[in-house]
Amino acid sequence: MSDLKEAIQLIDENKQFNPSTLNYFTKCLGDKNVGVKYHVISVFGSQSSGKSTLLNKLFDTKFDTMDAQVKRQQTTRGIWLSHSANIYSSGAANQSIPDFFVLDVEGSDGAERGEDQDFERKAALFALSVSEVLIVNMWENQVGLYQGNNMGLLKTVFEVNLSLFGKNENRHKVALLFVIRDFTGQTPLESLEASLVLELEKMWSQLSKPEGCEDTSFHDFFVPNFFGLGHKVFQPEQFDNDVKSLGDLFVDQDASFFKDEYHTHLPLDGWSLYAENCWEQIENNKDLDLPTQQILVARFKTDEIAAAAYNKFLNDYQSQVTDSLDGKELATVLKTLQSTCIDVDYDPFASRYAKKVYEERRDDLIKQLNTIIDETITNFVTRTTSSLIETFHKNARDRSLKGPFKLKIQSALEKASRTFKTNLAPFSELELLSSMDAYISKFEARVNTEVADLQERELNAIVARFNKGLTIKLKDTILHLLAKPTINVWDDVMKEFTSFLDGSLKKYTNEDGKIDFQTGATTDANDKTEHTLKRNAWSFLDHTVHGYLTEDNVVDIMRNVFNDKFRYDDDGMPKFWKNEAEVDASYRLAKSQALSVLDALAIVKNKDNVEILIPEALLESDGDGSDYEENGGQEEEEAGLYHQQRFSHVLSALQKDKIITKFKQFTDLVIIEAKRSIVNTTERIPLYMYALVVALGWGRIITILRNPATIILSIIVLAGAYFVHKLNLWGPLLQFANQATGQATAVLKQTVRSLVVDEEPKRKILVEPHESEGVDKEPSKNDQHL
């Protein structure tokens, strides 16, 4: 242990706390572990009343003191701290003395601060908060005075102290040691003591007490003690002996100065932090709580024990909790970890400390554990929910299961809910969950969402299959009826359309005649789907009819009808006209029937001449109807009528005129061709001309027939022509001939080009002799050209 006696300024005159206090303790004590075996003593009194001198004499400290022979002025500024292990007493030098930490507080009523008493009050309150013994240094002649013995300052300090600590059940008591300086003994110490106690009690009764502290007394917070010291200058020996006697009171372990209720019960490092916090709260006028040593130690130790237990819990948790555990296994592991942490690692060690603190920290630890447990259960529920949802989808779509989709969903839903509750039950049984209702409700909401999604998908699939059936089963039939129309073509079309629509909905019609698609969906969803099917069917019919019956297609249909009636009889045999009258009759009949087909196709109506309209309820709306309502509904009515008439009115009058014009052009050509064929037939070559040709050319015919080469060549040519015609090879043969002709032409051009190139050297040879004979001759025009 160091013999360091120099003091440090704990709080400077600018009210700043010294952050190196703990280092000072380390320098003073070295490696010594004092624990709570130390005492804090402070001194309070007027400026220049000899406080520092008394402390230096009594505790062997080195506080600065005033040189009265030079000037009386402020010496101690702020609050100073010094360590002492020596007490000036009459006892043996080697007796065991605890460690003392002495606070020298700046004197009150100094000229330097004047009327500024803020620091005086805060310093006095700080000394009361952190000290076991507060030495009140006063002169004997100040007893009975109010300002002279700092009673005004004490009243203010006591009042603030009461407002801060009065409601604390574990009140921190302080021993007030009134040291009466220059005590002459003329007035007995007991009389002075009685006067001071009376003043203190009277002052206490006049305090403004907070609610709940009305019945408190001065002695509930303070234990007054009194001691007289002789005059230091005029009674040096008496003063010395009195200081020794006072020191004996501090050394005597049985003295009343060091009762357990005075001590803060904090380790020394804890006292440093505690003192700093006290000063910060006093400086900032915050409520100050001075817990007892048991509370502080309990908090410190229970925090330490809880932290160790929690860390062990985390280590065990990371090694034992995995995603592969099922509900029962996971619940067992979590319950074991929780019980071990609380019952084994925390309770046996922490229960030895203050019950209230132990229970509070236990609750905090349980909350920490529950946070992890709840998070683990939530993750488990999330994984379980995802797995069950996936299984639910598989079961709902299992094609091996017979029955309506509604029964499949219901069965899959019951199975998923049952499995979920089974997996969650162990957590409730082991009290890891207070209630499963929240998780079950959340799971059911998730499953219901999936059910609604599957139902919607199934309804969409029904609509898709219906739309596909329209294309596969109905479209070709309608197009066939339109391609070969009759006068009652629309009755036939609507018969097929109604038959398909009713047949598609019949299997979904229940006994009450209402549509139920057996998906478990609501009535509104079924009605909406039924409406969609019917609307799609009519929309399909609309697009099919209007898409096929274009102007060109209608002209083709009329041509076919005209040709069938004009060129063929009722038995389907081709007609052979003998005269123009027959042609004209067939023409008029065929044209009339073709035009009647045009009239039938132009407007969708039944045999009773009533237009067939799309049901008004199935007409698609262009908006929410709000725009129509502003106009009294008139525009909406007109729009609906337009869509209905658009379906039934296939061809407009203008389109019919165009179609008739194109059709007339076709029929005019047909009748002209027919009449021309009659003329050609009646003006054929006479038969005697054929006989004359044979008679005159008989010799040539015999010559050809008698020539074997001609016969063989004719047979080969005729056979080749027959096979080419039979195999339909005239096209490839013609293409081959064209290619052969092209290649022959290319070869011929190449041959001519080669001949020209070969002729060129010969011409050069003929020219060179002439050039050698006359080099200076001008070249001829042919040479220049070459």
Curated annotation (Swiss-Prot):
Keywords: Coiled coil, Endoplasmic reticulum, GTP-binding, Hydrolase, Membrane, Nucleotide-binding, Transmembrane, Transmembrane helix
Topology of the protein relative to the lipid bilayer: Multi-pass membrane protein
Record keyword Repeat present: no
Parts forming coiled coils: 355-375
GO BP of this protein: endoplasmic reticulum membrane fusion
Regions of this protein lying in the Lumenal compartment: 706-708
Subcellular location: Endoplasmic reticulum membrane
Pfam family, one: RHD3_GTPase
Region ranges (Disordered): 765-786
GO CC term, one of those recorded: endoplasmic reticulum membrane
Domain GB1/RHD3-type G: 35-262
Chain ranges passing through the membrane: 685-705, 709-729
Parts of the chain on the Cytoplasmic side: 1-684, 730-786
Annotated InterPro entries: G_GB1_RHD3_dom (IPR030386), P-loop_NTPase (IPR027417), RHD3/Sey1 (IPR008803), Sey1/RHD3-like_3HB (IPR046758)
Binding-site residues, GTP: G45, S46, Q47, S48, S49, G50, K51, S52
Known function: Cooperates with the reticulon proteins and tubule-shaping DP1 family proteins to generate and maintain the structure of the tubular endoplasmic reticulum network. Has GTPase activity, which is required for its function in ER organization.
Family designation: Belongs to the TRAFAC class dynamin-like GTPase superfamily. GB1/RHD3 GTPase family. RHD3 subfamily.
Protein name from the UniProt record: Protein SEY1
